[in-house]
Amino acid sequence: MKAVLCKQFGPPELLVVEELPSPKAGAGEVIVSVKAASLNFPDVLIIQNKYQFKPPLPFSPGSEMSGLVKEVGEGVKGYKPGDRVIAFTTYGAFAEEVKVEATRLVPMPEGMDYNSAAAFLLTYGTSDHALRDRGQLRAGETLLVLGAAGGVGLAAIEIGKAMGARVIACASSADKLEVCKQHGADAGINYATEDMREKIKELTDGKGVDVVYDPVGGPYTEPALRSTAWRGRLLVVGFAAGEIPKIPLNLTLLKGCSIVGVFWGDFTRREPKAFASSIAQLGAWFREGKLKPHVSQTFPLEQAVEALKLMAARKVKGKVVLTTTA
């Protein structure tokens, strides 16, 4: 089988595609024949040795995929060869066959194609955990989404609207904001050309926002936190800007606000019942037509370098997906 390999840490150009032996399922494991695998910003970080998980070389990047169950290991219940599934892992998805723990599988929702399925679980799962669980977003509140045109950003917009919130999207260009509005955003802020804090004051009549969804970090976190309303919640989702911001803690005192961490990967392991409930809710919203994964581009597995270069340059709207002929 073919796999994208990181043999030395660095930019996407250092990745190679090689033939490897097919994996074998051990106890509690499943082999998935991959149809599609989507890119996420951690894939850019992990190949540079800048992610919190640091796998030994060589390894395949990629954390979510869709496909067919090829083989099940001893003790696996609920899955059989031929089942259509979504799978998630810390790394390893950019390959034609992937070995995963059975607990890392979710049945594909009816009516969902492989490309959309590969773009669904991590982005919508993260955003649902962030907004419903960690942020306690309520109907009628105002949600500010940073990096709103990315995969998790668009998912946050759709989930925020499904929950009855008013959503303000922040992105770096007019065309990105147009995509955000197509996915339900009520208003947009172009932080490349507009003063974010002043625009938030204007859009909220000076009240501020109730919840900030922040997968970006860098220079945007502090002004977003300063723009929260009383008892506001800032959700720390990631650091796509590359810089981990340093926040003056007196802001939390003055505003009675909270800074809340969101780590979906550990949540799925530590709280399996809550994770199952989240998946059930996401499936229901998908069937109701409220969630529509935005796959902007597809590449064959062999062109993973080109796809990751787009992700690293922050030129992606929604999700980019790698496809296989498996």
Identify what each model region corresponds to.
Residues 21-38, 50-92:
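Glycine-rich beta-strand-centered segment in the early N-terminal region that forms part
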Residues 219-291, 316, 323-326:
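Glycine-rich phosphate-binding loop and adjacent beta-alpha segment
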Residues 2, 16, 21, 33, ...:
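Residues located in well-ordered beta-strands
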Residues 33, 45, 78, 84-147, ...:
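NAD(P)H dinucleotide-binding glycine-rich loop of Rossmann-like/cofactor-binding domains
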Residues 93-96, 171-179, 244-249:
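Short, glycine/polar-rich helix-capping loops at beta-to-alpha or helix-loop-helix junctions
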Residues 84, 142, 166, 233, ...:
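Short glycine-centered segments of the SAM/dcSAM-binding site in methyltransferase folds
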Residues 118-194:
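Mid-domain Rossmann-like dinucleotide-binding core that forms the NAD(H)/NADP(H) cofactor-binding site
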Residues 196-206:
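Short amphipathic alpha-helix with an adjacent loop that forms part of the alpha/beta core around
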